[in-house]
Design a protein with these regions (language model features):
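Beta1-alpha1 glycine-rich phosphate/pyrophosphate-binding loop at the start
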Residues: 4-55
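Short hydrophobic core segments
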Residues: 5-7, 94-105
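Helical element adjacent to the flavin cofactor pocket in flavoenzyme catalytic cores
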Residues: 53-71
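A conserved short coil-to-beta-strand element within the FAD-binding core of flavoproteins
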Residues: 72-84
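Glycine-centered tight beta-turn/hairpin loop motif at sheet-sheet or coil-to-beta transitions
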Residues: 89-92
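FAD-site-proximal beta/loop scaffold in flavoenzymes
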Residues: 105-145
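A conserved FAD-binding loop/helix module that cradles the flavin
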Residues: 139-182
């Protein structure tokens, strides 16, 4: 199974973590609880009539750790490329196969890797949220600053995760189940 580091613990990062961990991949999510979700009150998230952003985050974190993802409250200080991606915090480094960046409106790590940007400074991505650097995905406000919504970011994270699952499987992957019979 692949190893994946996700920098950012908003809806995009946690959605990607859910899909990947649920399917047996080794996932570490880095976040310092500075997501804009802490200031949100959601009325427009399908399936949830309304919820405070902090409650949403608490539920989402519990869900992803329930599937085996690891949450780290350490800030990522740098990312390098060496037999994969070396993700460094103040106290440790890990090497992973894939990197998903959900850095918000200031994509410092994406820029440090030299990924392509458009004329507005948004990180250029394809429809699967792949950046110009192989195995680096950028989701959320960094890629779509004009479309910053929790549900859009969650969909972007899911899209990136499904692309990684497909690459690892060697064919398209769908992640859904039928309800238990009974």
């Amino acid at each position: 199974m692949a190893s994946v580091a996700i920098v950012g613990e908003g809806p995009g990062g946690l959605s990607a973590a859910l899909f990947l961990a649920k399917n047996g991949h080794e996932v570490t999510v880095f976040g310092t609880d500075k997501t804009a979700m802490n200031y949100a009150y959601l009325h427009n998230y399908l399936g949830i009539p309304e919820i405070e952003g902090t409650s949403f985050q608490r539920i989402a974190k519990r869900q992803v750790t329930g599937f085996g993802a690891t949450l780290s409250d350490e800030e990522v200080t740098s990312v390098g490329i060496e037999d994969g991606f070396v993700v460094t915090t103040e106290s440790a480094s890990i090497t992973v196969d894939y990197l998903i960046l959900t850095e918000g409106k200031n994509p410092v790590l994406a820029r440090s890797l030299g990924v392509a940007e458009d004329e507005s400074g948004a990180i250029k991505v394809d429809r699967d949220y792949r950046s110009s650097l192989d195995r680096v995905y950028v989701v959320g406000r960094s890629a779509r600053p004009e479309r910053s919504q929790a549900i859009i970011s969650a969909g972007a994270g899911a899209t990136a995760a499904l692309d990684i699952l497909a690459l690892e499987a060697g064919n398209n992957v769908q992640d859904w189940e039928t309800p238990p019979k009974g």
